[in-house]
Structure formats: structure tokens, C-alpha cells
A protein has these predicted regions:
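Mid-length scaffold segments of soluble, non-membrane domains
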Residues: 103-161
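Coil residues (strongly favoring Ser/Thr
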Residues: 37-38, 61, 164, 194
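Early exported N-terminus immediately downstream of N-terminal targeting peptides
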Residues: 56-100
Length: 213
């Protein structure tokens, strides 16, 4: 009888050991499987975009009136905007603006990639010159103390290939500097008493093209 009890005790001990080993194995597996929260927070694996890669210089759009699409959605019978500008926004990336990205006295597309484009929905006046409603590419020639801004009808083009026979107007505007350096090239409209300025800014350089309407 004593021997039977010993065999029974040994059998129970063996069952206990097997059970402990199984639980330990399950805990190890659980540790390898992430919880739902962890899966939610996990970043997706980067994969190649087979349709179109994200450009390093994002395309942007500016309206006058500012935020025109929001105004149109909020108010019925909103009249058309005065102007819309489409351009790409290169950034400094620790480079100096001049002699690093731009050069004085050399034409620049005022952006990146496609030629920057401005659409006037009504006739406007710039420095006394009448500009008819329509689409134009807009580019500039930066100088030390002023910029030359050009409107040209050679639309839907890439980069900047000058065709001066299609110029709609050339305008010289002063430049200034401020204490704030902008990483991204920026063009926006600001309201004035006679219409709006097209503000052109990058790094600490600011130029303004006055538009009357």
C-alpha cells in the first residue's frame, strides 16, 4: 500500500510539472503576440507607391479672398474669387537662400516643378498696367534691392523656359527683410485698401506685388 501511494504521488507530481510547463509555454507565446492597442499604435511598414511618389516640394494653393473655398461653402451665391495661385513650395534644408538655391539676376520659377500659375477671374491693374482676366504663369528675377515679377501666357509648362514674346507684363517691386526666417517658400494674398498684395516670402526675404481691382 505504501508503494502504491508513492507511485500515486509521483504520478501527481509529474502531472503538475507538465501543467506548469504548458502554462509557461502559453505565456511565452502571449508575449510574442502584440495586444490590439499595440497593433493600433504600430507604424505601417513603408512601401513603394506605385502610382505617384510624394514630392519633396508640396504643391499649394492661395486664393483671394483668403480661404475663398470655405467662404463659398458657408455662404450661398458667393461671387467668384479675384485670384487663385497654384505653386510648389521648396524648402531651405539648411541651405542659404542665395548662392545656395537662388542666384541674383537669374530667372526663377517662383516655386518648384511645374511653372507657378496665377488665375485672375476678373480684370486687374498692376502698377498702372491692365491685366486681362485669365491664366498666367508667374516667375521672377531676384535682384539685391528689388525683384522683377513676370506674368506670361505660356501656361501648362514645367520648370521655366522663358518665351518673352508671351509676356503679359513685367513689374519691379521692392524687397525687404524681416527677423523671421521661413523654411518653406510661401506666396499668399493680403488685403489692401485698393485690392490685394501678392506676398512672396522665403527665408527672411519678402517682396509684395500690388494688385488693384
Amino acid at each position: 500500500m505504501k508503494q502504491v501511494n508513492q507511485y500515486l504521488a509521483l504520478f501527481l507530481l509529474l502531472l503538475f510539472a507538465i501543467d506548469c510547463k504548458q502554462k509557461q509555454k502559453e505565456e511565452t507565446v502571449d508575449q510574442k503576440v502584440k495586444s490590439p492597442d499595440s497593433l493600433i499604435n504600430q507604424q505601417p511598414e513603408p512601401t513603394a507607391n506605385t502610382y505617384a511618389s510624394v514630392d519633396i516640394s508640396p504643391m499649394d494653393m492661395s486664393y483671394f479672398p483668403v480661404d475663398y473655398p470655405k467662404i463659398k461653402m458657408a455662404h450661398a451665391n458667393t461671387p467668384p474669387p479675384v485670384a487663385r495661385l497654384i505653386y510648389s513650395r521648396p524648402h531651405l534644408q539648411r541651405r542659404p537662400l542665395f548662392n545656395g538655391i537662388l542666384k541674383y539676376d537669374e530667372p526663377w520659377r517662383l516655386g518648384a516643378n511645374e511653372a507657378s500659375e496665377i488665375n485672375f477671374y476678373k480684370n486687374v491693374t498692376i502698377q498702372g498696367k491692365k491685366i486681362r482676366a485669365g491664366r498666367y504663369i508667374i516667375y521672377g528675377i531676384p535682384h539685391v534691392d528689388k525683384w522683377t515679377i513676370i506674368l506670361n501666357s505660356n501656361i501648362d509648362t514645367w520648370g521655366l523656359k522663358q518665351d518673352t514674346t508671351k509676356d503679359a507684363g513685367r513689374f519691379e517691386i521692392p524687397v525687404s527683410t524681416n527677423g523671421t526666417s521661413l523654411e518653406y517658400f510661401t506666396m499668399v494674398f493680403e488685403k489692401t485698401d485698393t485690392g490685394a498684395n501678392l506676398v512672396i516670402a522665403w527665408a527672411d526675404v519678402v517682396a509684395k506685388l500690388p494688385i488693384e481691382f
